[in-house]
Every structure is written in structure tokens, then in C-alpha cells.
Amino acid sequence: MTEKVKQSAAVTGSDEIDIGRLVGTVIEARWWVLGTTAIFALCAVIYTFFATPIYSADALVQIEQNAGNSLVQDINSALANKPPASDAEIQLIRSRLVLGKTVDDLDLDIAVTKNTFPLFGAGWERLMGRHNEMVKVTTFTRPETMSGQIFTLKVLGDKRYQLVSDGGFSAQGVVGQPLNKDGVTMRVEAIDARPDTEFTVSKFSTLGMINNLQNNLTVTETGKDTGVLNLTFTGEDRDQIRDILNSITRNYLQQDIAWKSEEAGKSLAFLAKQLPEVRSRLDVAENKLNAFRQDKDSVDLPLEAKAVLDSMVNIDAQLNELTFKEAEISKLFTKAHPAYRTLLEKRKGLEDKKAKLNGRVTAMPKTQQEIVRLTRDVESGQQVYMQLLNKQQELKITEASTVGNVRIVDPAITQPGVLKPKKALIILGSIILGLMLSIVGVLLRSLFNRGIESPQALEEHGISVYASIPLSEWQKARDSVKTIKGIKRYKQSQLLAVGNPTDLAIEAIRSLRTSLHFAMMQAQNNVLMLTGVSSSIGKTFVCANLAAVISQTHKRVLLIDCDMRKGYTHELLGTNNVDGLSDILAGKGEIASCAKPTAIANFDLIPRGQVPPNPSELLMSERFGELIAWASSRYDLVLIDTPPILAVTDAAIVGRHVGTTLMVARYAVNTLKEVETSLSRFDQNGIQVKGVILNSIFRRATGYQDYGYYEYEYQSDSK
């Protein structure tokens, strides 16, 4: 014989135990974790297939320095060539002035949407290649009384269509021809769809569509103070978003040109009004000068007076130029602005010089003073008049060749690929989310519903553990097979004591057999009851195999299936269910002939019988006591398999007739609280439970180290 002993030392560090338990809990639930993660990933894949793709189009525009008006050029020089105000231009691009014209140009206030199944319909149409079907509607109006109605356009074929509403309106139209009926006007320019395809036609307000465009439009400056703006527009239709963005850039350019042209026009109007007045004043000044010369016999000015006169004329010309500049700059800034203050300071300096020159003129003889004054008026008037004529010609050229300050660098183009949804990112995120949620769920379930994880946990609370039965992999592989209706069916070969008598679980049951031999020596009778804390914990498995291993010691054993609701021992042992316990207790069968032999020697069975409506009442009858007395006198051991004590009271009733009671609890399933509650139920009924059998102990992912177990395997040599 060869003995293999596997021993693991108990871990004493509490922190290490907790970490190991958490990791082990996750590893044990790995299939649930992987399944949950796979479901999340599958949902993500389905979403990416059926989600509406969002595309992106972009364009590039440049805002150049002001180049149309010479007056504005001079102002820019006063502003020290400050770069264009990109923030203001961005707001202008997003304004109702620009976007409203785009809505009108492209008829964006009219929406035509293909009718599909909810949620997945549009995605299915894309997968089938039918997402490009369209109807182009350029005109659609309806009375205010019909504003709440839903209009549906149905394609009839041969360039015909039918327009109906949920309010009872119905009309037929032809492509390219206006439809007018009951105040409803529609013009369809093109149809590219199969007959019987339906579309919903909606009319939105211009303001609502402008808001929609603003939500989908992004304008950013490329670099800092470059004056280059990047426009991005997103939407579901690749062609439409390109057309919308091209329209926005075109309308922005046109409004800039229109504004510049309007500016030049206003300046021309101002000059046209001023020129006659200036010419009139010039004529008056010339007449006065000529009259004075004739009166004084053509007086000549000395060189000093002529120099003063030239300086005064030059200063007047500069002051007049500043007047034009001030007229322009006052439209842009207040007097507190640095540029405006610079202009005012320059004017003040010229006026101071002019005052000094006037002082010098005052010191001259009166005749020279008058000649200087009249000559200055004429020459200043001539300069002003010529300036105005030059400005007029410049503005006429500017108005005729206005190009604005905006240049479209890159027209709109739709980027290849899909902007949203990002399939790889969504799938990866779903996998991570599914993994995290499943792990958190496993840990929370383990935290709030921690089952018994060691016999020591029971013994520390004063509960005797009679046996610790490991989970049998052999039994697990040959366990119940479910039929179509979900009812468990068993085969006789599945009884572990017969199919694999050397299994560790059977060795543990043999150890239990030895313990019972001494435990029942002082019992009032040879009747042993096995009950359970809850259902599906392997109680019947323990009971049947215990009966089998005891019968192998040449003792006569009778197993009574007292679970008249769900008992299946007859299927497990390969006997019939005729004349079972319920039939005997109901008086339909004889006690003396109720025991049925099984395929195992010295092992008889009383099956549960037909399912009665009142199992508890039958167990309380005197006939059940007679059955127990009869069985106790004819068998060496009577085993009674009862339902779980927490589910029904049958075990408490049967317990009054037995000498020994053991309770089965399942490892990592039943909690300590459940065991204590079950024992309390028996105490309330005056029944003493000898101890607990801990069933289905399995090697956890963290091993048996947590419990300091010793696992023995003793097999025959292969020689």
C-alpha cells in the first residue's frame, strides 16, 4: 500500500487570509465572471452594429487683416497691427445671421426620416444596404391647426407618392410638381426608394434648426492669434454635413463681403454729401482772396509770412485727415480706448502748433494778416477738396472690388471613417465594465452571504461536527441529468458507494459510520434521522450512501424517505414508488410488506409514495409510530431522510420517534446563522441534535490553507 499525505499549514496572518479569500472567491466564480463579461461584450458588439454612425466634416478659413478701406488701414496702424479678433469671428460664424441663411438655403427646417423598427430598425437597414433610400422635399407648409399632426409620405412608384396624416389628411402628388390641398403645400424634387417605403415628414422652426446646427458645429482657432479657424460639423449623413459646412463657410464669407461693401457705400454717401459743401466753401474763399488782391493791388507776402502760411496749411491738412480717422475709429472704440486717446493727443499737438502759428500771424501787419488768412482758407480748402476727391475714388474702387477679410482655405470635406461610435473603445470598455461589475457582484455576494467555510467555525460556537464530507468529482461528473421539463432523473450507478467505493467522500462517510456506532450506543432506539438546513445541500446523497456503507458491514438497514413532497430516493436506488410511505400512513398499504429490497444486499427502502396533500398530518398519525416500532424491531439500523427543518416542520415531528438526530449543512452555502436557527427549531420541539455533517467540502482556489486541513489519500499500489 502507498500512502500519500497532503498537509497545508494554517495561515495566521489575517490580512493575508482576507486577500487570499477574495482572490479565491473570484477564481471560484470565474465562469460566472467570464459569462457576465461575455454578455457585456456581446451587448457592446450588438450596439456597435446597430448604433447610428456619426460622421465629421471640417473646413478651414482664414481671417486676414483689414484690406478694403484705406481709412481703416490707418486705424489699424494706430492699433499697432493688432491681430484679428478670432473670438468675435467665432461667435459671428455661430450667429443666427449665418446659420439662419444656411437653414433657408438647404431647407433644413424640413426633415424626412425613413420609418423603421424602433431601436434596431435603422441599424438593420444599414446592414441590408437600404439606408441610402431618400426623398428630397424642398417645400412643406401646413396650417397652424395641423402643426401637431404627423405626416407620412408613402412611395407609390412611377414618381408618385401619397401624403397622409394621423389627423385624416390624404393627398397624392407627383415628383417635381407642387401639391396643394387643404392648406398643405409640398414639393418633392426627387425620390430614391422602393415602392411602399414610408417616410415621416416633419416641419421644424428655423430657430430650432439653428440651435441644432449650433450644437453640432465646433469652431476653434488653429494656434494662438493665427486668425485661422477650423470648423467641424457632425451628423448622420456624410453628404449633408459636408453641404451644411460648405454653406456655413460660404454664408460667412458673403456676409463679410456684404458688410465691407456696405461700409464703403456709407463712406461714399458721406463724401457725396460733403463734396458740394466743401466746394462751395472753397469757391467763397477764392472769391474773397481775389477781391482782396484786386482791392490791395496784388499784395505779395514776404518769405517769413509765406513760410508761416505753408505750415498752417499743412497743419490744417493733418487735422482734416485726423477728422476722417476719428469718424472711423469712433465706430469701433470709445474715447477711453488707447487708440482713440492716441488720436486725440495727436490732434491736440497739432492744434497747439496751429495756435502758435496764429500768434505769429497776429504780430504781422494787418494787410499781411488778411492775406495770410484768406490764402490759408483757399489752400486748405483746396487740399480738403482734393482729399475728398481722392477718398471718393478709393472707395469706389473698394466697393467695386470688395473681397472681405475672410478667405476659405479648405472647403468642407467629410472625413473617412466614423467619428462615433468608437467600436473598439466601446467593446473594450464594456469588457472592462462587465469584468469589474461581475467581480464586485461576486465579492459583495460573498461578503453579505458567507457560508460555512470550515468545521472550526461550527465548533467555535459549540456545535459538534460529526463528519466533513469532501465534494466528489466522480459524483459531480455523473450527477443528475435534466429532462426537457427540467425534472432530475437518476440512475442506480450514480450511487457513489457502489460506483466508486474508494472515493474520498465514501471514506468520510465510513468515518461517519464509525462515529455513529459509538454515538448511538446510549440512544433510546436504533433509529437515526438525517435532516438538513435547507434544500439542495446533498442530504439525500449522504443518507443513501451512509445506508449503503453500513449495509456493507452485514447489518440490515432500512431507509425511509420521509420527504413526501420532493423525495427521489426510489429513483436513486432503482426501485418503484408504489405502496410508499404516504400510502402506508393513509392506510392503503400493509406495514409488514412496505419495505422494498434494493440492489445492495441488506439494504431495504420505503419510498415516499404518492405526493399527499397533507404530509405533516400523516406523520403525526399513530400509524407512523407503529411503522417506526416495526422497523426498529426488524432492522439493525433505521435511517430516516426528512425535509429541511427551515422549510417545513416534518423533521420536528419525526424527531420525536428517533433516538439520534444529525443535521446536514453544505460547505460555503449554508451560513452559521441558518445552522443556529435550525438547532433552535429542534430545541423548541424538545429534540436534541447530536451534531452536524458538513457536506460537499471542495478545494477552494486559495487551497485549504485557510483551515489547516489535512487531506489524506490512501490507495492500493499499482503493482
Swiss-Prot record:
Gene3D superfamilies: P-loop containing nucleotide triphosphate hydrolases (3.40.50.300)
Annotated metabolic or biological route of this protein: Glycan metabolism; exopolysaccharide biosynthesis
In-chain residues carrying the UniProt-annotated modification Phosphotyrosine: Y568, Y707, Y709, Y710, Y712, Y714
Organism: Salmonella typhi
Membrane topology: Multi-pass membrane protein
MF-aspect GO terms: ATP binding; protein tyrosine kinase activity
UniProt lineage: Bacteria, Pseudomonadati, Pseudomonadota, Gammaproteobacteria, Enterobacterales
Cysteines paired by S-S bonds: none
EC numbers: 2.7.10.-
Entry protein name: Tyrosine-protein kinase wzc
Domain of life: Bacteria
Pfam entry (one): WZC_N
Places the protein is found: Cell inner membrane
Major place of residence: membrane
Posttranslational modification: Autophosphorylated. Seems to be phosphorylated through a cooperative two-step mechanism. First, Tyr-568 is phosphorylated in an intramolecular reaction that generates a significant increase of protein kinase activity. Then Tyr-707, Tyr-709, Tyr-710, Tyr-712 and Tyr-714 are phosphorylated in an intermolecular Tyr-568-dependent reaction.
Residue ranges crossing the lipid bilayer per the database entry: 31-51, 424-444
GO BP, sorted A to Z: polysaccharide biosynthetic process
Catalytic activity: L-tyrosyl-[protein] + ATP = O-phospho-L-tyrosyl-[protein] + ADP + H(+)
A GO-annotated cellular component: plasma membrane
PANTHER family documented for this protein: TYROSINE-PROTEIN KINASE (PTHR32309), TYROSINE-PROTEIN KINASE ETK-RELATED (PTHR32309:SF32)
Family: Belongs to the etk/wzc family.
